[in-house]
Amino acid sequence: MHEVGLFVDLNSFTQLILTLFFVSIGLLYFVKRTAAKYFEVGGGSGGFDRDHRRDFMVSDTAECSVCGKATTKKCSRCKSVRYCSAACQTSDWKSGHKLKCKGFRSTDSSPVRRDDIDFEASLFGNRSASKKTRIALVPQQSQSKATLKPTDVLFPYESFVRYYNWDRPIMAPCGLTNCGNSCFANVVLQCLSWTRPLVAYLLERGHKRECRRNDWCFLCEFENHLDRANYSRFPFSPMNIISRLPNIGGNLGYGRQEDAHELMRFAIDMMQSVCLDEFGGEKVVPPRAQETTLIQYIFGGLLQSQVQCTACSNVSDQYENMMDLTVEIHGDAVSLEECLDQFTAKEWLQGDNLYKCDRCDDYVKACKRLSIRCAPNILTIALKRFQGGRFGKLNKRISFPETFDLGPYMSGGGEGSDVYKLYAVIVHLDMLNASFFGHYICYVKDFRGNWYRIDDSEVEKVELEDVLSQRAYMLLYSRVQPRPSNLRSEESQDEKKTDTLNTESNQDGSVESSGVGTNDTSVSSLCNGIISHSEDPEYEKESSLSASVPVSEEGKEVDVKVDTVDSESNRSIDMEHDSGTDHQEEEANGKEDPTVENLAVDSSCLDITTPSPSAATEFIPQENERSDTESKPLEKEHSDTESNKPLEKEHLDSESKPLEKEHSDTEMIDAQ
């Protein structure tokens, strides 16, 4: 009799079991990776949630959390803490409860300002005890910000100075888990988390209530990130920000290796856009008011590009807003100071790279120099280590100091207070000088002055010597003292000082002609908060060494006002001078009348940004100038709106005899 059964191969059965086991593991891993894009994952998140919940667990007894008295009033945000009076509530919030219950605050669709919050206890003694009585924490809605005047300031500079000097100590740095090639984002978030004015603003005042964005907002998410990092004792995942990298920068993507410097620039630009959105956006806010945001106060500075023509001495100054400095490290430069010397070195525009001079209307040889017109409060310096090619990274060591003076690289010589202290360093680690892969770590200094080495989730306390010995990729410096506030009184004082110097120069018989004085005065407002722009969106201003001056009457002082002359007027003066048109001059009280001639400086490139009183005596007449006894001054035809121009005294030979006056002081001669 035969037995009926199912024959099973043991080897095949074992292979089937193993296959199903590995397939199930793969499916679980796939589900975890997919869920990580939408949910917070990481070993530290659970610990944070437990601590977070434990902080807000309260007993069922209705006792005040401060004095222990019986009460029925609750915190309107977390609904977990009870108070008996507004004094107890204020005391508890100052002790730290305000930051702890931020995550529970009610979302208000209308933007309000926290500066106007008035915490008052709602006392309803006649109401039933079953009804919940709470403390009113929602402020009155502020006035609308939609209507702006051209002179409006979006963020008071005095408030920024208060945040800049914020001295509230917070906990040590908290690590961030690597979510897959996210080290470049982790180091940027760590550096921003220790930028004092930004952290003080988000923790003390906050951005969520004022945010006007309907979609995802970087500042709102970064505020949540700071709240979590401030109270978390374990590393946590910054997935809420990393998963939104395409929203921060168009070419950034999650899971790819990216450049930390590129992300830093995108993040700063995004925060600037968010600040402008509170007032209607970049298209609504006037250009002058756009320079008065919190982000502009923190990272914004002004870069000056000065080009001087060697043929006509025309100087063109162009100003550009900067959020960071990117310097070359090629050549023999081995220190940060030498790199900045190369950055601000004079460059000759010649050969195939001639300069198109508007005054000469031709391509001529010129001298170009970059300098810092206005130093930012937070200076971010990126060293260009990545060159062309997959193995083109420059791994040479560039020394950098802890205390850094930016004064020698300022166009005006600095204000004497341009001293910075190092507070963050970003380092890129690689193999074989590869530029297409690597790992980012950072060193940050907390608000107590302690240095930490942060490698994703690993945080280690280090000494300053270890920081200064690194091959840095990015350096973040903060000013020892914040930049002085921009006051219009300072600008008026500068103008008054300029007029006083010109008047004294007239009394001494040596009147100077320079269009740079007004250029510097008008740009002085760019350095601190309110920026005065010209009609040109590129902030381009041109100054000239040629001008016209009205003839002064006998016994009266010559009123000299510094002004700039555009390229069109310069060309018209040149044409009149070439046509040989002559005018008459007179002698009054033993002094020659003011005259105007085209003067050319030496072929060497002079730094006209900071003119000295003796600089005017170094001018050399052009070749087409007539001899001392035959030369006749050229006088520009006055328009109805023409103002007084600075004059340049003509040096005549002692043997020359002045011509007699044939026309009155106010008579105009046709140059045609």
Swiss-Prot record:
In the UniProt record, which is one GO cellular component term? Answer: membrane
Name of the protein in its database record: Ubiquitin carboxyl-terminal hydrolase 19
Membrane-spanning regions, if any?
11-31
Q: Which SUPFAM superfamilies match?
A: Cysteine proteinases, HIT/MYND zinc finger-like
From the broadest rank down, the organism's phylogenetic lineage runs:
Eukaryota, Viridiplantae, Streptophyta, Embryophyta, Tracheophyta
Q: What positions does the entry give for Zn(2+) 2 binding?
A: 75, 78, 97, 101
Q: Which GO terms describe its biological process?
A: protein deubiquitination; proteolysis
Record gene name: UBP19
The EC number(s) given in the record are 3.4.19.12
ZnF (MYND-type) ranges:
64-101
Keywords carried by this UniProt record: Hydrolase, Membrane, Metal-binding, Protease, Thiol protease, Transmembrane, Transmembrane helix, Ubl conjugation pathway, Zinc, Zinc-finger
